[in-house]
Amino acid sequence: GAALQQLADAGLDDFYRGDVAREIAADLERIGAPVTRTDLERYHARLVAPLMLKLPGLSVANLPPPTQGLASLLILGIFERLGEARLDSFEHHHGLIEATKRAFAIRDRYITDPAELDHPPADFLSDAALMREAAAIDRKRAAKLPLRNGDGDTIWMGAIDGNGLAVSYIQSIYWEYGSGCVLPATGIHWQNRGVSFSLDRNAANPLLPGRKPFHTLTPALAR
């Protein structure tokens, strides 16, 4: 409660550069975590242009890397080009599942820290690229999963009011107990998003100083 009250009184920037940041850094040092107060002070939110996908009758926006917004747009774009409009048919479900597999394969290979991207994300959303992915789908046979099938328990909520003000909210600490690290001074429970890093320096998301981890956020907006 005290940490939340301090943030309410001093402003949210106190989390990174104020008294709350000081308490966080001290607790992290005590438990041997490598995150320092300097790391907290260097953090800045980035205002970026969204990725856009045009579909019949609407446009869909989502965030670029390091989130998986690209993957959600790929699923929609590939599936739309399959032309399977009959809801709840075998073709509909099969097409959606296979489009997801194709999108996840691209996600796992290319999405990384935006400063380290090899390909502009928007290139994957071109009509030619989406048609190529759709054409690679077998309409009758399931492809092998491109990734290990794990558990999932993240929740997402969205709300929009009569004035068009929208909120996209996701609650996730990645694993059941996140990092398992609760800081005693503030009561803050730290999530475990860093698990998406790899100790292989040649991997798409290597654990290196200053790198941003891959994140599963997908705050979509359709218009």
Tell where the protein language model's regions lie, with residue ranges.
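Active-site rim segments in enzyme catalytic domains, especially the processed small/beta chain
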Residues: 35, 165-223
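Generic, well-ordered alpha-helical scaffold segments in large soluble proteins
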Residues: 3-10, 23-31, 43-46, 74-82, ...
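Internal maturation/activation junctions in enzymes
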Residues: 83-172, 185-186, 193
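Hydrophobic alpha-helical scaffolding
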Residues: 10-15, 30, 61-69, 85-93, ...
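Short, small/polar residue-rich loop motifs at catalytic or cofactor-binding pockets
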Residues: 47, 151-154, 215-217
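Glycine-rich phosphate/pyrophosphate-binding beta-alpha loops
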Residues: 61-69, 155-158, 168-182
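Long, well-ordered, tryptophan-enriched scaffold segments
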Residues: 1-61, 65
